[in-house]
Amino acid sequence: MRLVIARCSVDYIGRLKAHLPSAVRLLLVKADGSVSIHADGRAYKPLNWMSPPCVIAEEEGVWRVTNKAEEQLVISIEQILHDSTHELGVDPGLRKDGVEAHLQVLLADRPDAVREGLTLVRREYETGIGPVDLLCRDADGSTVAVEIKRKGEIDGVEQLTRYLSRLDDDPALPHPVRGILCAQSITPQARLLAADRGIACSVVDYDALRGLEPSIPTLF
């Protein structure tokens, strides 16, 4: 991971245009290729970001970050106050709480509860940056990656986006790979971002799933 603290301005050029005026900010460049711009506020949320895969071109005083859709972040750097790179190694990942772990078990037995026609290929399919909860196939034989959360939020969409970018490069899988964020509830912000990323959303009833026998069909 590369950490850069710099006085900079930022322009987003894509479907919309956005501008961050000059200020001191933290630039995070992660090993997965993502770039995010942070202020000393907003908790963990960046002011702007570019999800992987993307290409970073560093010129004198300017970074140009371009993704597959040809959207760009143009970071104009006036002064660098700190620049360091750290090797963090492979992260073991976040352990799911009891509900999320149990949901994964239940939905592995009943993938049709996520979306009609899904069949399970494998649980915990490794992507190289962490395992996606369920790898499935739909009725047409297409690959579907399902990420399971107790509550679906923006972080879950970002996580699934990173997994999908890796799965799209997996030669063992039929392409393209679609994504579904599955949770007991999903926030409006997460739904909006998911729709923008081409990710479907599925809400499941944990209590109902716990009471279902595998032989009993259900509609959600």
Curated annotation (Swiss-Prot):
It is found in: Cytoplasm. One of its GO terms (molecular function) is single-stranded DNA endodeoxyribonuclease activity. It is an enzyme of class 3 (hydrolase). Its main location: cytoplasm. Its EC number is 3.1.-.-. Keywords: Cytoplasm, DNA-binding, Endonuclease, Hydrolase, Nuclease. InterPro entries: Endonuclease_NucS, NucS_C, NucS_N, NucS_N_sf, tRNA_endonuc-like_dom_sf. The keyword Repressor does not apply. The keyword Cell division does not apply. One of its GO terms (cellular component) is cytoplasm. CDD domains: NucS-like (cd22341). Coiled coil: none annotated. NCBIfam families: PRK03298.1. HAMAP family: NucS. Cleaves both 3' and 5' ssDNA extremities of branched DNA structures. Belongs to the NucS endonuclease family. This is Endonuclease NucS. It comes from Parafrankia sp. (strain EAN1pec).
